[in-house]
Amino acid sequence: MAYRNKKKKRKKSQFRRFLYVALLAINILVGLPLLFSFLAQYIPPSTSKYVAFSGIAFPYLLVANCIICFLWIFVRYQYLIISLTLILLNTNTIDKHYQFKGVEKPQKCAQCIKVMSYNVRLFDLYNPTPSEFGKGKEKIFNYLKIEKPDIVCFQEYFLDKGNKLNFFTTDSILSTLELQNDERYYYQYFPNNLRNEYFYGLAIFTKYRIVNNGVVELEKGSNNIAIYADIKYRSDTIRIYSIHLTSIHLDKIDYETGKYFSQNLNDPNLSKKTKNIYLKLDVAFKKRELQVKMLKNHIDSCRFPIILCGDFNDTPASYAYNQLAKKFKDTFRESGQGEGITYHGDAFPQYRIDYILYDKRYKSYGHTVTNSIKV
């Protein structure tokens, strides 16, 4: 009887030891990348691509480490300090991804300015369904009519200059926002056009008079640019930026691969199939690093308070976002709620990649993200 009890105890001890070793190995596997995701905001992608990729995975690494912490309580509670330390180290990064306060705009706010940033994806111009042509644009205009922003910055803006498509944008927006048809109240710049008829670029519309404007070339020969408009607000001048950093340039095959990836995680050839996406991500990280450097130089030379709106094509844990956000407050962090997701991909994870940053002298109220318009 005593021998049998000893045997049971030995088996139990061996199982606990196996559990401890397995959990420790998993802890290291998910703990190190979480440390790298913390470092992603400081280390340029050109220095370490692995750190940059860990930044993308931050939300998933955070959840994994929380689960590990919970499991250590039942195995060896002293070891939960590993993941707990890493989670606490990332407190600031967590704050960039999740918000619970949701500060609402006061009922009376005479000095408040309503600002909107919107990547309109060419107003859904290339919708493959003929019957849907122009409907995406109308949804956007209806939304603008309801929200009535004082300042709106557009990325992936489209202008049908000759009105050959009967696809009016600039005139319609001026009418919708009840702005004067005067270039002192809007600024648009198009780095790319087709046959000098169809123009693609960025735009800023404002109810406040523009006293100066210009373009910031972020990369030679690239369509990714920033534009700015200095507006007169009361006795102050405020600089508004609308920016669009480089995207990953995923194509149809990449999206199909992404869908396959999410459904076939056990495929031994998965790394080969996703290699193209990996390479595109790596290139995009490094390009955004250089683009942010150019933009920061321009921002540093400005003597006015700044509001910076745009599609960064990068996450809150990224080097690009954190380099730009250093000098500013983030509307989501100051007055947002939830995750603030702005990219809803079918094949890829959802992220916050669009931002409004602003001068630290100002205050933010009622940051919201609309999910009602699909274009």
Show where each model-derived region lies:
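N-terminal Lys/Arg-rich, disordered targeting/topogenic segments
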Residues: 1-17
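Residue-level signal for alpha-helix termini/capping positions
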Residues: 74-75, 145, 234, 300
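Membrane-interfacial entry segments at the cytosolic side of transmembrane helices
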Residues: 74-85
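Acidic/histidine-rich helix-loop elements
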Residues: 117-135, 158-165, 249-284
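Sec-exported extracytoplasmic/periplasmic mature domains
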Residues: 145-149, 178, 210, 300, ...
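Metal-dependent phosphoester-hydrolase catalytic domains
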Residues: 22-34, 39-70, 81, 215-217, ...
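Active-site beta-strand/loop signature of hydrolases that rely on acidic residues for catalysis
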Residues: 114-120, 139-166, 229, 239-244, ...
